[in-house]
């Protein structure tokens, strides 16, 4: 993906999704700022999530996020214990044990959950998400189909908006219908103004891992 900040190119991002065995997944996301941007405000972000698909539902097992600001490195980790019904959450600000119920996900696995629900035609109105050491409820809305002009040509998409509980931040996703609802554009808005956008640049497919 190409990364834009307030309409200007500021870096790139790489998303990797691997199928593990018959029902497992490993998802990775990395944001790399351009060298000049990194000198001014370095925010190299790496996220990874792993889990499994059961009865069409995404069940995350672990999530790790590492943010390098140039001055310090911050890390957040979530471990999902489904048999015990608990989430062990740890960040630089502290740690907590949170209750775990069906449908709860992490920030990265949320993408996979929406992709799966769109394929099944069963997109809910909200998702329960753990970010840091706090559970949050995000409102989800299907805003209909839209054809995008991308680096890979015209792509038919479904536009889906995700709004934070406080309503101050909305993220809009465009999921490609013909590519199993892979996100081809992601735009973040604060108080109605776009501050970040990802545009797909290339797509590679490989055989599933055992």
Which residues does each predicted region cover?
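Acidic, serine/threonine-rich low-complexity disordered tracts
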Residues: 1-82, 91, 116-210
């Amino acid at each position: 993906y190409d990364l834009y900040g307030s309409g200007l190119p500021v870096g790139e991002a790489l998303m990797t999704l691997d199928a593990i065995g018959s029902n497992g997944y490993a998802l990775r996301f990395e944001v790399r700022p351009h060298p000049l941007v990194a000198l001014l405000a370095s925010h190299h972000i790496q996220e990874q999530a792993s889990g499994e698909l059961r009865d069409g539902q995404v069940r995350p097992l672990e999530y790790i996020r590492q943010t390098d600001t140039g001055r310090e490195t911050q890390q957040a980790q979530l471990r999902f214990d489904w048999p015990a019904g608990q989430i062990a959450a740890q960040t630089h600000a502290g740690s907590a044990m949170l209750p775990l119920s069906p449908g709860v996900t992490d920030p990265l696995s949320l993408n996979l959950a929406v992709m799966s629900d769109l394929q099944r035609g069963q997109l809910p109105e909200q998702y329960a998400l753990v970010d840091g050491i706090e559970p949050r409820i995000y409102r989800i809305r299907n805003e209909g189909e839209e054809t995008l002009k991308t680096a890979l040509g015209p792509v038919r998409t479904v536009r889906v908006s995700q709004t934070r509980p406080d309503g101050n931040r909305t993220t809009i996703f465009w999921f490609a219908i013909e590519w199993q609802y892979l996100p081809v554009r992601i735009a973040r808005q604060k108080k109605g103004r776009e501050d970040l956008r990802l545009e797909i640049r290339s797509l590679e497919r490989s055989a599933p891992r055992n």
